[in-house]
Curated annotation (Swiss-Prot):
Disulfide bonds: none annotated. The gene is NDK1. It is found in: Cytoplasm. Major role in the synthesis of nucleoside triphosphates other than ATP. The ATP gamma phosphate is transferred to the NDP beta phosphate via a ping-pong mechanism, using a phosphorylated active-site intermediate. It comes from Candida albicans (Yeast). This is Nucleoside diphosphate kinase. GO terms for molecular function: ATP binding; metal ion binding; nucleoside diphosphate kinase activity. The active site is at H4. Pfam families: NDK (PF00334).
Length: 21
């Protein structure tokens, strides 16, 4: 998330989805 600067939206959304699940 914070580490990712370029793909903060796409990567974050996918990572967040996994965290929520």
């Amino acid at each position: 998330n914070v580490c990712h600067g370029s793909d903060s939206v796409e990567s974050a959304n996918k990572e967040i989805d996994l965290w929520f699940k």
